[in-house]
């Protein structure tokens, strides 16, 4: 491994460790996403507790912190294997952030940003897959799961040299969605457009019930 490749992997992990959900909520004086809603510091949970603007800001920053290190590594002609490890490092930083006691999100937006530099055709397919799944089902988590399952096949078709690293990345995303898969199977997963409705209508009793359900999970 060259010094440049090692440096990019470390840089990617540190970029991923910047929890935009926590920082945006602090700036906007919103509740800590690690302690409210689903407890996941990501854009979907910020949508629940803070609304669309805060969620969109988190989403953009989460995508960029995956995209930036991989793009720089790509421009520095890092080999495909280490380029893939750079992408994985960014996602690991998001999931286990060194700056936030290793309690992070699920890495979907960061993984999407990390895959984007491979090609815009692939990016378009991934976006379309996620959007179509969410529009048909209403479940953001299902969109992420389906996209993670299909991503290695898309990459194999367009850029086969990146198939193995992207497959590893997909496995990481699927592992982080273990609880969501169980809730989907039991029919207890909440739909994405229900989140704003719940934010407006939720009573203290409902919040207590949601917290109890979360503890049972």
Swiss-Prot record:
Residue stretches spanning the membrane: 4-24, 54-76, 80-102, 112-132, 138-158
Pfam families membership: G3P_acyltransf
Enzyme class: transferase
UniProt subcellular location: Cell inner membrane
Record membrane topology: Multi-pass membrane protein
InterPro entries: G3P_acylTferase_PlsY
Cellular component, GO annotation: plasma membrane
Keyword terms: Cell inner membrane, Cell membrane, Lipid biosynthesis, Lipid metabolism, Membrane, Phospholipid biosynthesis, Phospholipid metabolism, Transferase, Transmembrane, Transmembrane helix
GO terms, molecular function: acyl-phosphate glycerol-3-phosphate acyltransferase activity
BP GO terms, sorted: phospholipid biosynthetic process
Pathway assignment: Lipid metabolism; phospholipid metabolism
Keyword Transcription tagged: no
Catalytic activity: an acyl phosphate + sn-glycerol 3-phosphate = a 1-acyl-sn-glycero-3-phosphate + phosphate
Family under the similarity heading: Belongs to the PlsY family.
Protein name: Glycerol-3-phosphate acyltransferase
Organism: Yersinia enterocolitica serotype O:8 / biotype 1B (strain NCTC 13174 / 8081)
Gene name tied to this protein: plsY
């Amino acid at each position: 491994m060259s010094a440049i490749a090692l440096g990019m992997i470390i840089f990617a992990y540190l970029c991923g460790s910047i929890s935009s959900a926590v920082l945006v909520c602090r700036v906007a004086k919103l509740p800590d996403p690690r302690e409210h809603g689903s407890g996941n510091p990501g854009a979907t949970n910020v949508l629940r507790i803070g609304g669309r603007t805060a969620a969109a800001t988190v989403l953009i920053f989460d995508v960029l912190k995956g995209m930036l290190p991989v793009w720089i590594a790509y421009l520095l002609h890092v080999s495909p294997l280490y380029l893939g490890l750079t992408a994985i490092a960014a996602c690991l930083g998001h999931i286990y952030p060194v700056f936030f006691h290793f309690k992070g999100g699920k890495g979907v937006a960061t993984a999407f940003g990390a895959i984007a530099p491979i090609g815009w055709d692939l990016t378009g397919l991934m976006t379309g897959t996620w959007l179509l799944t969410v529009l048909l089902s209403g479940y953001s988590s299902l969109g992420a799961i389906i996209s993670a399952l299909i991503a290695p096949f898309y990459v194999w078709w367009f850029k086969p040299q990146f198939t193995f690293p992207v497959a590893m990345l997909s496995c990481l995303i699927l592992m982080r969605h273990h609880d969501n898969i169980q809730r989907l199977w039991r029919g207890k997963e909440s739909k994405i457009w229900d989140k704003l409705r719940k934010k407006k209508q939720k009573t203290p009793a409902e919040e207590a019930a949601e917290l109890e359900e979360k503890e049972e999970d």
